[in-house]
UniProtKB/Swiss-Prot annotation:
GO terms for biological process: division septum assembly. NCBIfam families: GTPase_YsxC, small_GTP. The keyword Membrane does not apply. Its cofactor is Mg(2+). This is Probable GTP-binding protein EngB. GTP binds at residues 30-37, 57-61, 75-78, 142-145, 172-174. It comes from Chlorobaculum parvum (strain DSM 263 / NCIMB 8327) (Chlorobium vibrioforme subsp. thiosulfatophilum). InterPro entries: G_ENGB_dom (IPR030393), GTP-bd (IPR006073), GTP-bd_ribosome_bio_YsxC (IPR019987), P-loop_NTPase (IPR027417), Small_GTP-bd (IPR005225).
Length: 192
């Protein structure tokens, strides 16, 4: 896939009013502060396309980005962040699960996993949930550049052992762009 245009489309706080134009949706999901917004900026080669923050839980809405005028990248709120109120955390969780369960336009879910902490319970639960919903998913190990070589091998083995149903696993560094071409190649298979 060659991304020639990437623009913020709209944010939604509920499933009401989501686009109904039939474009496929590639959805990015993961724990809070896993690097979803940074990955989107890197993937689209557009710094500032998706708002980033060092504060976990910054993405609180469903954010749509129109890619090449023919599909959407969708940034969902992160899960697993403990420092927001219980009610707000439940609200994000309901928004995320309702979207994944009910949205017919989803072509692929891309689960971002912090390479420094592969195999966390919440990530495993998300994989099980995606399997249960029958959603095809791939995994991106983010922050790959932060690992030493021995840690990279261990992280890869760990995620492979718990992600047998993933369509792909890509190692990614938003900082250097390592893994970008491979991920775009994988996403292209689901962009039609």
């Amino acid at each position: 896939m060659n991304i020639t245009s990437a623009d913020f489309f709209c944010s939604y706080s509920s499933l009401n009013g989501l686009p109904s134009d039939g474009r496929p949706e590639i959805v990015f999901v993961g724990r809070s502060n896993v690097g979803k917004s940074s990955l989107l900026n890197s993937l689209c080669a557009r710094k500032g396309l998706a708002k980033t923050s060092s504060t976990p839980g910054k993405t609180r809405l469903i954010n749509y980005f129109l890619i090449n005028e023919n599909l959407y990248f969708v940034d969902l709120p992160g899960y697993g962040y403990a420092k927001v109120g219980h009610g707000e955390r439940e609200s994000w969780g309901k928004l995320l699960t309702d979207y994944v369960v009910k949205r017919d336009e989803i072509a692929l879910v891309v689960l971002l996993v912090d390479a420094r902490h592969p195999g966390m319970g919440s990530d495993r639960e998300m994989m099980e949930f995606l399997d249960y919903c029958g959603r095809p998913f791939g995994i991106v190990l983010t922050k790959w550049d932060k690992l030493k070589q021995a840690e990279k091998s261990k992280a890869r083995r760990t995620i492979e052992s718990c992600a047998s149903n993933a369509r792909f696993i890509v190692n990614y560094s938003s900082l250097s762009g390592a893994g970008r071409d491979k991920l775009l190649e994988r996403l292209d298979l689901f962009s039609q």
